[in-house]
Amino acid sequence: MIPTGLLIVDDEPALLGLLRRYLERLGYDVETCTGSTEALARFQAEPDRFAMTITDLSLPGMSGEELIGKMRELRPQLRAIITSGYYYEPLAEAVGFLQKPFLPQALAEAIEKARS
């Protein structure tokens, strides 16, 4: 089975709720987590569910970049987008970067770009 889920990680619950509602209306299977430890546990429980993770760079516990690395130990082909309020030069771990604040439509476009 081809994974289709999106795992979105950010320590701002209001932003997570907004993105979840928007992306679900577009037909995505969305799971949200407010921390890296919770996200890693969720991913480890269902690694074949998620096609992509979208994570904030600055998270309590471990950075978004570290989180992506740990997830890719289980699924090397996992696609990823990092978000941050600070400029960030994406490394090999990420296929995309979105500077905060961003519009939900910009995230949808970044997801489509990362999927292709």
List PLM regions with ranges.
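Short hydrophobic/Thr-rich beta-strand motif most characteristic of the beta2 strand and flanking loop
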Residues: 27-35, 42, 79
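Conserved phosphotransfer cores of two-component systems
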Residues: 44-48, 70-78, 86-90
